[in-house]
Every structure is written in C-alpha cells, then in structure tokens.
Amino acid sequence: MQRDRRYRYRLAPYNKYQLPPCEEQSKATLSTSENSLWPECNSLTLHNVSEVRGIPSCVGFTVLQEWPIPWDMILTDYEMFILKKYMSVCMCCATINVEVTQLLHGHERWLIHCHCQRPGSLQCMSAGMLLGRWFKMAVYGALINKRCFWYREVVNHLMPKEVMYVGSTFVRGRHLIYFKIMYDGHAWLALEKVSFGWSAFNYGILNNMLVLCCDYCKDLSEIRMRCCARRTRLLMLKVVQVIAENTVRPLKHSRHERYRQQLLKGLIMHHRAILFGDYNQRENPWAADGH
C-alpha cells in the first residue's frame, strides 16, 4: 500500500480541465451483477492499494465511513479505458474507520482498495497510485462544502432523517451531489418511482448513497449554485413524498440535523475537532420521532 504525502490546498483546480458534456448519461438503478457498471464490492478479494489524506471539508463523508465515487462522471474517456482494462475497482473503493479513535479532526486517512486477482503485483501497485491521484481530485473538490456551506442548510431544511443530503464534491466542472437514503425499501421506492437524471446509486456496506451529477453550476456562480440547491431539494421532496405515500409510519423532520450542522461548521470553518459519538448521538434508525 502506497501513501502520497504531498498535499496542497487549492481552489484553482475547480475550473481547470473541465470535461465536455456527456453524451451517454447513466441512470441510478439497483445494481446487480448483470447490469452494474462496476463490480460488486467483495470482502474476499478486497485489498488496500493506496492511502489518501483527507481535509476538514470531507468530514461529511468521514462520518459515513465510506465514499462512493462514480468514476464515469469525473474521468476522461482515456482514463475510463485504463480503469476498465487494467483495474478492478468497485464504485465505493474508499473507506475509513473512525470508530477506533472516535475523534474527527478532518485529516483522517482514506484507504483505497481494489479487487484485482494479483494483489501486490506491479500492475496492482501502479493502479493503486493512479487511483489515489484520481480520488484526491474528489478530496480537493470537497472544498466546495466550505465555500458553500449554506447548501446543506438549504437542502436539509425540515427534511426527515430517512432522506438527507450529506455533502458534495466538484471535479472538472462536474458537481457531484450526495444524499443518503436510510432504509433499503425506501431506496427501492425512490429509484422505482422518481427520475433523477444523470445519477448513480451505491448500495454500500454501511449506507445507501444516491449521487447526482450537475454540470449547470460549473462556473460556481452564486445564482447557479442557488438554482442547483433548489433543484436538489425538489428532488429530495419528491423522494419524501413517494416514501410517505407507500409507507405507514409518518415522516417527521430531523431534530438533530441542526446540531450536526453546527458540529460540521465548527470543524470545516474553524478546525474544531469533534467526537464521532457526538455526531451520531440519539441516532436511532428505528425511531419514529424524527431524531
């Protein structure tokens, strides 16, 4: 496993080397071995190949302990050719374990894994270094969470705990928007009845994550970011409506989300470390009281 020690805080790469408009936009589906673009994450073949240091702006993904990356949304055609031909990478190849230390300071190290048949080979090591560099683009892009922290406040206003926006990253003119659907049944309903446009769904070990890709706000102007937030919120409200129509238990707004935003803002803006237990306190996925 290789570690890249060089790291730079830069906002400039946001608008450098923007990708052209995508002609074939994928749709979020419940992936199976037949229709999935990425191989299934199998713990029997999993082995770590690289390590990337995070920044405080990534803490929204750190608390989830996994970060799915739809590679087809941020890589060029040639890079996708290399990834498919010489690598065996699942969609959620970046994981982290924060339950041991319980302290989140924003500079945790993400472990990148692959599922190739020859772990430790020269090809595997080279792929690990390249994967680390590609993943670092997403880490750099997470600085948009610091620049537009209001995005989470707007999108998650009075939303239930079952559907929550968790963070964004901005890579090569593509804005990847992540939100978490707590229950498997709710995720199935959302994917079955709501059209999300260019999107991807990851059925992870710990979370159900839906990733939306927006290229309308590629210039990062205030008005376009506001329009993007409004569109994201409308899609989330559609998901909430679909879930409410097909379930018995009522959906109530999360009373813990504002406290979480205060913790995240203190870490992202002022580098105040937080405890993982404080972020997840009173979190009960089976409670109907909106926590």
Curated annotation (Swiss-Prot):
Pfam family membership, one: Adeno_E4_34
Gene Ontology CC: one annotated term: host cell nucleus
Main location: host cell
Keywords: Early protein, Host cytoplasm, Host nucleus
InterPro entries associated with the record: Adenovirus_E4_30/34
The keyword Disulfide bond belongs to this UniProt entry's keyword annotation: no
Subcellular localization(s) per the UniProt record: Host nucleus; Host cytoplasm
Function: Plays a major role to prevent cellular inhibition of viral genome replication by nuclear bodies. Assembles an SCF-like E3 ubiquitin ligase complex based on the cellular proteins ELOB, ELOC, CUL5 and RBX1, in cooperation with viral E1B-55K. This viral RING-type ligase ubiquitinates cellular substrates prior to proteasomal degradation: p53/TP53, LIG4, MRE11-RAD50-NBS1 (MRN) complex, ITGA3, DAXX and BLM.
Family as reported in the entry's similarity comment: Belongs to the adenoviridae E4 30 to 34 kDa protein family.
Subunit field text: Interacts with E1B-55k.
Name of the protein: Early E4 34 kDa protein
Source organism: Human adenovirus A serotype 12 (HAdV-12)
